[in-house]
Structure formats: structure tokens, C-alpha cells
């Protein structure tokens, strides 16, 4: 296997502690990537069905994990379709489910994928090789919609001037690559407002990547599908890397673990409802200082987990 897709799984020890894989149990890894988390589960004796949209990641991870034989199966699919994939395979439920919502290092580092602003690459940003590219998106939407995307998905305070500058550059400069796009974005933000620790285009690139891949829609679908995917006693874990994702996971997990559905002004519960899930993590689990020193990209990782009760 090419070394390009080898990566150190984030929060590896914490994942094993929370998911507690046992020999023979079946797990669903919704974001195979370099195969790091799937490898952890397989090493513990579990069986794994893994999904990924990226054919290169699938090929590389499949080669890496081939030694586990029939215990490992990779499927080219978006994790939003996890339930459909399991049904197609004749599987009613799994003992655990995991998603790692970060972009893999190879995707970030390969200029031709269009995720990096440090080197020139095409305006692509697709996790797979199908669907609308970033350039397609930028040409299809107007300045107002672009500003909304930057504000909502990137929490960019200068969304309007950035959107204006990007649309203007798209019309006057051809071809526009990722390095030049980053320069355009940075130029639209007052230098005194540049973030201290990240490139000024980071928020914009995050927002555009989320929009191109409908990442929040995929996460919402995965979260909504958990009750129908997990067997009783099954555990689910999600690793997020920015506040939008973490907020979605936190709110959905909270909703799953709540029992009473009565209006908040009722003094006594009248519905008699019982929670179908229990929280495993009371707050987000973060990487240790040692892991961050070894893998700086783990700094923003947030892990939350729940267990299905019935």
C-alpha cells in the first residue's frame, strides 16, 4: 500500500475504551480513510464493515487491512447511507458505529484534491470523485448565497467582503487555483483581523468543503439513522473537528438520551417515556497533550459517545 494513506487514528485509546470492541462483534466504520480506526477494532478481534466515498482511500486501506481476511469488508459509500448499506448486505444491526469527521492527511496534503491553500490545485474539494466540484458550486451560486455559506459553515465574520472578492476573482482570473483563492480570501479580510494561529483563508476553505460535500447533511442523516443501525447494547462514537459538527452531535446525543417528552412547564412527567440511549461521555473527550505533540491535527478533535439501551 502507498504510504500516502497511512495515518495515525485520532483518539485511538479513547475509542477503544468507549466502544469496547470484543471478539466477533460487528462494527460499522463510516469513515474508513486510512483505515486507522478500523485497524484498531480489527486488532481487538471485532469484525468491521467500513465505508468511504474516496476510491483511493478504499483501495489503500483495503490493501493495508487485507491480513484480517473476511473480518473486514470495505464498501464505497457515503456514511449517510449506512443503514441502506447494511440492509443491502443483509445485516439487521451492528454492535458499534464510528465516524471520524476529519479530512484525512493525504486529502489535505495532495494539491490536486483542492483542499490545500498552501500549494496550487484545482477548485475541487470533493471527498470522492463524483458530484459537483468547488468551481461548479462557486459558478452556480450568487454572491449572497456564498456569503451565507461562509457565515454559517465557516463562521467567517467577513463573509460578505470575502464572497464579493471571490466572485470577482472567479470572473476576472482564469484559471483560479486554490493558492490564488486563498490569497483572494486573505486580501478581503483586514490584516488586523487575521487569526493568530491559522491561515486567514482557513474558515472559508472549511465552509466551502462542507458545502461541496454536504457534510452537515451527511452527519445529520447518520445521527438520525443510529436507532435503526445499532443493536441493543451497541455503542456509537463521533469524532468532530469544528464547532458546527460537535454541536450537532451533542444536541442529537442529548435528544437520544432524554426520556420525558412532556412540555417543560409540566411539574410532573405524564408521558412515561423511557430513554432508548444512555450517554457514555458527559462532555466531549479531547486529545491528550502527548497525542497533540505527536499529531497536531488532533488538537481540535472532540469525541462523544452513546449506548443504545433497547
Curated annotation (Swiss-Prot):
Listed GO MF terms: rRNA (cytosine-N4-)-methyltransferase activity
Pfam families: Methyltransf_5
SS bond list: none
Catalytic activity: cytidine(1402) in 16S rRNA + S-adenosyl-L-methionine = N(4)-methylcytidine(1402) in 16S rRNA + S-adenosyl-L-homocysteine + H(+)
Annotated keywords: Cytoplasm, Methyltransferase, rRNA processing, S-adenosyl-L-methionine, Transferase
UniProt keyword Cell division, yes or no: no
EC number: 2.1.1.199
Top-level division of the source organism's lineage: Bacteria
GO CC terms of this entry: cytoplasm
InterPro entries per record: RsmH, SAM-dep_MeTrfase_MraW_recog, SAM-dependent_MTases_sf
Binding residues for S-adenosyl-L-methionine: 35-37, 52, 79, 100, 107
Subcellular locations according to the entry: Cytoplasm
Chief localisation class: cytoplasm
GO biological process terms held by the UniProt record: rRNA base methylation
EC category name: transferase
Function recorded in the entry: Specifically methylates the N4 position of cytidine in position 1402 (C1402) of 16S rRNA.
Family per record: Belongs to the methyltransferase superfamily. RsmH family.
Protein name: Ribosomal RNA small subunit methyltransferase H
Native organism: Anaeromyxobacter dehalogenans (strain 2CP-1 / ATCC BAA-258)
Amino acid at each position: 500500500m502507498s504510504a500516502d494513506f497511512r495515518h495515525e487514528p485520532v483518539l485511538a485509546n479513547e475509542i477503544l475504551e468507549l466502544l469496547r470492541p470484543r471478539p466477533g462483534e460487528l462494527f460499522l466504520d463510516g469513515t474508513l480513510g486510512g483505515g486507522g480506526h478500523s485497524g484498531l477494532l480489527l486488532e481487538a478481534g471485532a469484525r468491521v464493515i467500513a465505508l468511504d466515498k474516496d476510491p483511493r482511500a478504499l483501495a489503500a486501506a483495503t490493501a493495508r487491512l487485507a491480513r484480517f481476511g473476511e473480518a473486514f469488508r470495505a464498501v464505497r459509500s457515503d456514511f449517510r447511507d449506512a443503514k441502506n448499506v447494511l440492509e443491502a448486505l443483509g445485516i439487521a444491526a451492528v454492535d458499534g458505529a464510528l465516524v471520524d469527521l476529519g479530512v484525512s492527511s493525504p486529502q489535505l496534503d495532495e494539491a490536486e484534491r483542492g483542499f490545500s491553500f498552501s500549494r496550487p490545485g484545482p477548485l475541487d474539494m470533493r471527498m470522492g470523485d463524483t458530484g459537483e466540484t468547488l468551481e461548479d458550486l462557486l459558478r452556480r451560486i450568487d454572491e449572497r448565497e456564498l456569503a451565507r455559506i461562509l457565515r454559517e459553515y465557516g463562521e467567517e465574520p467577513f463573509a460578505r467582503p470575502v464572497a464579493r472578492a471571490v466572485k470577482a476573482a472567479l470572473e476576472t482570473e482564469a484559471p483560479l487555483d486554490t493558492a490564488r483563492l486563498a490569497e483572494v480570501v486573505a486580501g478581503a479580510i483586514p490584516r488586523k483581523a487575521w487569526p493568530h494561529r491559522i491561515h486567514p483563508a482557513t474558515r472559508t476553505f472549511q465552509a466551502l468543503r462542507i458545502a461541496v460535500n454536504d457534510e452537515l447533511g451527511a452527519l445529520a442523516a447518520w445521527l438520525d439513522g443510529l436507532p435503526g443501525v445499532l443493536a441493543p447494547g451497541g455503542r456509537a462514537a463521533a469524532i468532530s473537528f469544528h464547532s458546527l459538527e460537535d454541536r450537532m452531535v451533542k444536541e442529537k446525543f442529548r435528544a437520544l438520551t432524554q426520556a420525558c417528552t412532556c412540555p417543560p412547564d409540566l411539574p410532573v412527567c405524564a408521558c412515561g417515556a423511557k430513554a432508548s440511549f444512555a450517554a457514555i461521555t458527559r462532555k466531549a473527550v479531547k486529545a491528550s497533550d502527548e497525542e497533540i505533540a505527536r499529531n497536531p491535527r488532533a488538537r481540535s478533535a472532540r469525541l462523544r459517545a452513546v449506548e443504545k439501551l433497547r
